[in-house]
Amino acid sequence: MRTAMSCGGGLAQRLDFSSSDEEDGMSPGLEEGSHSNQRGSPVNSWRANNCPFPITPQRNERGLSPSQEELSPCSDYSPVPSDKGVGGECPGTPLHYSTWKKLKLCDTPYTPKSLLYKTLPSPGSRVQCRGQRLLRFVAGTGAELDDPALVNVNPFTPESYRQANFHPNGKRKERPEDDCSAEPQMKYAEKEHPAVFQSKRFVLRETNMVSRYKTEFLEIEKIGAGEFGSVFKCVKRLDGCFYAIKRSKKPLAGSTDEQLALREVYAHAVLGHHPHVVRYYSAWAEDDHMIIQNEYCNGGSLQDLIMENKKEGRFVPEQELKEILLQVSMGLKYIHSSGLVHMDIKPSNIFICRKQTEVGQDESDGEDDLSSASVLYKIGDLGHVTSILNPQVEEGDSRFLANEILQEDYRQLPKADIFALGLTITLAAGAGPLPCNEDSWHHIRKGNLPHIPQPLTPAFLALLKLLVHPDPVMRPPAVSLAKNSLLRRCVGKAAQLQKQLNVEKFKTAMLERELKAAKLAHGSGKDECSDLPPMSDFSCRGRKRLVGAKNARSLSFTCGGY
């Protein structure tokens, strides 16, 4: 496509609009228009002084409009309107800007370079990207990230919490946003989400190429291993605190263990923080492996304590057994009150935290404040947790399994945790290993405890037998165990005696202070009397008569010789 521009009736310049030569043709033109000083050619002089190539909106790097760029101080071009109109312009008059735009002398047809400039963001954009591919990727996935169907819903969330955050008809609440148009505000308003109350299958996928585990944590040692995975003692690089990081042994994406891993995360998130439940901090996926960041318990597990006592030939004393039973019962009380059951209570899932108390630190103010004790027992490993109202039971260790669970009778699910707790305390008392099956297994399910080598009080032994009663209805709930007077008698006894001692010391100090003040007052009175001159008999008699309130008025008439 070729055209010509007439100047004074002659051919001034031939313009070539071929797509292949456009970029090469424009660059020399720019160089020629800005650096050429040829005076022999009137065309070159006109191009250099009056007709610079305008910058298109796609190539405008400074955010200026085409009109601002053309009228900038750097350019000598100033279009002068002609009285003759567009068609009657003088041969030497430069083209008007509107006429120049109609000719479309720049970026038409588009070349690969000009199309590339069109994909770049405008200079006024607030978000700066590192590259064009990242920008296009983010823009393409933004709608997918806003889709609520891709968000997991915790199946253990209480119904009251759901009703408080969602309309009864299942619609999301509208949350107005500032500085936004009305259309984004109604993004989720009045929009049905039928699957928002249903638990969806979450696929474990890693979104970042950099390992968060290696970046944020320094692995110290391996402290445990189980069927699900391994547990490592790690220190976080940011805060310098120790954490227990649990990592699955094998990839879980698409496997049957995937729901078990998610169930533990769901339970930890719903339960929150309790002094007798291992604290949960975070969870994420790396290379299809589930990683859970939990509280680090420096005392190990109850199973470790049992094995250590067995090697040394020692037993956990009865007072300590009662404290373990009480604290674990309080943890189960909290779990059961949340509508959940643990379903895998055993010594290896009860962890010990030993607090470093300073010398002279005040003891507990009461027996109910168990969180201030020097040793805390906490329930962990929530991989088998299920809901009481909607049970999806995954059987735990068969050695601690109640008979009704084996018969698939889920009407008294919390009592299964009580049965397992009774056997756990029995093992801590020194009983031998529990059977996995056969007649000895059924013998225990009939309400018989294994042999305990150390002597226990009849009351405590009867309580342990009640925990493993064959009828789940007869087993005491966790609420009753937490208030049991047999367990409460030993807990906080030292603190109670210390409190009474402090009260008696305070009373003694107050009495000593009053006695000292009385002695000082008595001594000062004697000194004042010794300094005074001797009194007459009349004054002494008068002072004596004033002592009695009833006698003062009657005896006053006898004084003075009246």
UniProtKB/Swiss-Prot annotation:
Residues 35-48 have a biased composition (Polar residues). Residues 494-520 form a coiled coil. SUPFAM superfamilies: Protein kinase-like (PK-like). GO terms for biological process: meiotic cell cycle; mitotic cell cycle. InterPro entries: CC_SR_Kinase, Kinase-like_dom_sf, Prot_kinase_dom, Protein_kinase_ATP_BS, Ser/Thr_kinase_AS, Wee1-like_protein_kinase. Mg(2+) binds at residues 349, 381. Residues 1-86, 161-181 are annotated as: Disordered. Residues 217-491 form the Protein kinase domain. Keywords: ATP-binding, Coiled coil, Kinase, Magnesium, Meiosis, Metal-binding, Nucleotide-binding, Nucleus, Transferase, Tyrosine-protein kinase. The keyword ATP-binding applies. Transmembrane segments: none annotated. Pfam families: Pkinase. ATP binds at residues 223-231, 246. Its main location: nucleus. One of its GO terms (molecular function) is magnesium ion binding. The active site is at 344 (proton acceptor). Its EC number is 2.7.10.2. It is found in: Nucleus. GO terms for cellular component: nucleus. Oocyte-specific protein tyrosine kinase that phosphorylates and inhibits cdk1 and acts as a regulator of meiosis. Required to maintain meiotic arrest in oocytes by phosphorylating cdk1 at 'Tyr-15', leading to inhibit cdk1 activity and prevent meiotic reentry. This is Wee1-like protein kinase 2. It comes from Xenopus tropicalis.
